């Protein structure tokens, strides 16, 4: 396990968040983000 500086940890957390958003198929997982459909969480196109 690599223990970096606070900056490194922040960057890693950010990358993990980006990966989560990229592979999230549930619109409500992140408000307004990560949806794999043209609809938002209110089902408005």
Swiss-Prot record:
<keyword id="KW-0378">Hydrolase</keyword>
<dbReference type="GO" id="GO:0045493">
    <property type="term" value="P:xylan catabolic process"/>
</dbReference>
<comment type="pathway">
    <text>Glycan degradation; xylan degradation.</text>
</comment>
<keyword id="KW-0326">Glycosidase</keyword>
<keyword id="KW-0119">Carbohydrate metabolism</keyword>
<keyword id="KW-0624">Polysaccharide degradation</keyword>
<dbReference type="GO" id="GO:0030245">
    <property type="term" value="P:cellulose catabolic process"/>
</dbReference>
<comment type="similarity">
    <text>Belongs to the glycosyl hydrolase 10 (cellulase F) family.</text>
</comment>
<dbReference type="GO" id="GO:0031176">
    <property type="term" value="F:endo-1,4-beta-xylanase activity"/>
</dbReference>
<keyword id="KW-0964">Secreted</keyword>
<comment type="function">
    <text>Has xylanase, avicelase and cellobiohydrolase activity.</text>
</comment>
<keyword id="KW-0136">Cellulose degradation</keyword>
<protein>
    <recommendedName>
        <fullName>Endo-1,4-beta-xylanase Xyn10A</fullName>
        <ecNumber>3.2.1.4</ecNumber>
        <ecNumber>3.2.1.8</ecNumber>
    </recommendedName>
</protein>
<dbReference type="GO" id="GO:0008810">
    <property type="term" value="F:cellulase activity"/>
</dbReference>
<keyword id="KW-0858">Xylan degradation</keyword>
<dbReference type="GO" id="GO:0005576">
    <property type="term" value="C:extracellular region"/>
</dbReference>
């Amino acid at each position: 396990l690599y223990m970096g500086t606070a900056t490194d940890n922040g960057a890693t957390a950010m990358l993990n968040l980006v990966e989560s958003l990229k592979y999230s198929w549930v619109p409500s997982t992140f408000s307004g983000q990560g949806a794999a459909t043209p609809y938002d969480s209110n089902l408005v196109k």
